[in-house]
Swiss-Prot record:
Family affiliation: Belongs to the phosphatidylethanolamine-binding protein family. Mitochondrion-specific ribosomal protein mL38 subfamily.
Presequence positions on this chain: 1-26
Keyword Nuclease: no
GO cellular component, one term: mitochondrial large ribosomal subunit
Protein name in the entry: Large ribosomal subunit protein mL38
Cellular location(s): Mitochondrion
Keyword Magnesium: no
Keywords for this protein: Coiled coil, Mitochondrion, Ribonucleoprotein, Ribosomal protein, Transit peptide
Organism encoding this protein: Pongo abelii
Coiled-coil annotated residue ranges, if any: 99-127
Assembly notes: Component of the mitochondrial ribosome large subunit (39S) which comprises a 16S rRNA and about 50 distinct proteins.
Lineage per the UniProt record: Eukaryota, Metazoa, Chordata, Craniata, Vertebrata
């Protein structure tokens, strides 16, 4: 009978000791101003003014809530949003669109749909078909560039490519890899493409005015084997006339992605720049073929900084890639080097200092501090 009483007393002492110790060590400083209700005399509650009406109490409560205070309320503490650092926009200016014209076109489209009896009947019978190509074209024309910008910020492309500067990809960039004779593997905004699917030169299309010049590059953000802040240039086409990609100058020939085994998922980005004039890229030209990784070391930020007066980023498309069997062929046959293999080494598990008398610990407690892997549970 004494055991429960003794444990209860010991538990109470521990709780009292922990509370008192924390109160002493808290080092509470005096408040910066008067505390709430500190001006009320609590010695004689009968003399306090009574509201006698809920409306009077509500008006008084609203006045008190709107009055400035030196402390922060719960909502102010957890609902306060820190203003993000304003980033530099290096992209093309937004198109000038009349809001009135947009509203008129939208109302006209709604009137036409309501007047179309066949569409109404198909929608009621659930047999209506939606043209997805038209929906995607409308999305790319309106809110698609801003969605792509948010995805690029989520994947850290602007942070690693342009050191935090941002731009809205206003020119839709369509990239697709040919897989077999009839199939295509498209590149969207972060979908996964295997190195086998990206072995050949992709098909790139975009809308451009006649007489304009463009630059297209493909870079790997996470694949450099020696420098952590460098990239590998996989493809660079310059002075592209209009949207005729095949007629552009091949400044750097295409090299398939080669994410090393065990290095995880890599990001590869297609960037489209609009040139204001013809540019001489002879300093950035690579030999053809170019299978020396040192010659493909690249930094997008330095490249753009060098030609920022004559070109502007306009389009963006990126995908993710991880190792497969074709990477071994690229290292052995194309790059003529041994294939690097990485392995994640987990840190040793942390254990607190061993106690001489492990009170209320399981029988496996000693296994944490044994050099051998032979368990003690079931031996004794």
């Amino acid at each position: 009978m004494a055991a429960p009483w003794w444990r209860a007393a010991l538990c109470g002492c521990r709780r009292w000791r922990g509370f008192s110790t924390s109160a002493v060590l808290g080092r509470r400083t005096p408040p910066l101003g008067p505390m709430p209700n500190s001006d009320i005399d609590l010695s004689n509650l009968e003399r306090l003014e009574k509201y006698r009406s809920f409306d009077r109490y509500r008006r008084r409560a609203e006045q008190e809530a709107q009055a400035p205070h030196w402390w922060r309320t719960y909502r102010e503490h957890f609902g306060e949003k820190t203003d993000p650092e304003e980033k530099i926009d290096i992209g093309l200016p937004p198109p000038k669109v009349s809001r009135t014209q947009q509203l008129l076109e939208r109302k006209q489209a709604i009137r036409e749909l309501r007047a179309n009896v066949e569409e109404e009947r198909a929608a009621r019978l659930r047999t209506a078909s939606v043209p997805l190509d038209a929906v995607r074209a409308e999305w790319e024309r309106t809110c698609g560039p801003y969605h792509k910008q948010r995805l690029a910020e989520y994947y850290g492309l602007y942070r690693d490519l342009f050191h935090g500067a941002t731009f809205v990809p206003r020119v839709p960039l369509h990239v697709a890899y040919a897989v077999g004779e009839d199939d295509l593997m498209p590149v969207y905004c972060g979908n996964e493409v295997t190195p086998t699917e990206a072995a050949q030169v992709p098909e790139v299309t975009y809308e451009a005015e006649e007489g304009s010049l463009w630059t297209l590059l493909l870079t790997s953000l996470d694949g450099h084997l020696l420098e952590p802040d460098a990239e590998y240039l996989h493809w660079l086409l310059t002075n592209i006339p209009g949207n005729r990609v095949a007629e552009g100058q091949v400044t750097c020939p295409y090299l398939p992605p080669f994410p090393a085994r065990g290095s995880g998922i890599h990001r590869l980005a297609f960037l489209l720049f609009k040139q204001d004039q013809p540019i001489d890229f002879s300093e950035d030209a690579r030999p053809s073929p170019c299978y020396q990784l040192a010659q493909r070391t690249f930094r997008t930020f330095d490249f753009y900084k060098k030609y920022q007066e004559a070109m502007t980023p306009a389009g963006l498309s990126f995908f993710q890639c991880r190792w497969d069997d074709s990477v071994t062929y690229i290292f052995h046959q194309l790059l003529d080097m041994r294939e690097p293999v990485f392995e994640f080494v987990r840190p040793p598990p942390y254990h607190p200092k061993q106690k001489r008398f492990p009170h209320r610990q399981p029988l496996r407690y000693l296994d944490r501090y044994r050099d051998s892997h032979e368990p003690t549970y079931g031996i004794y």
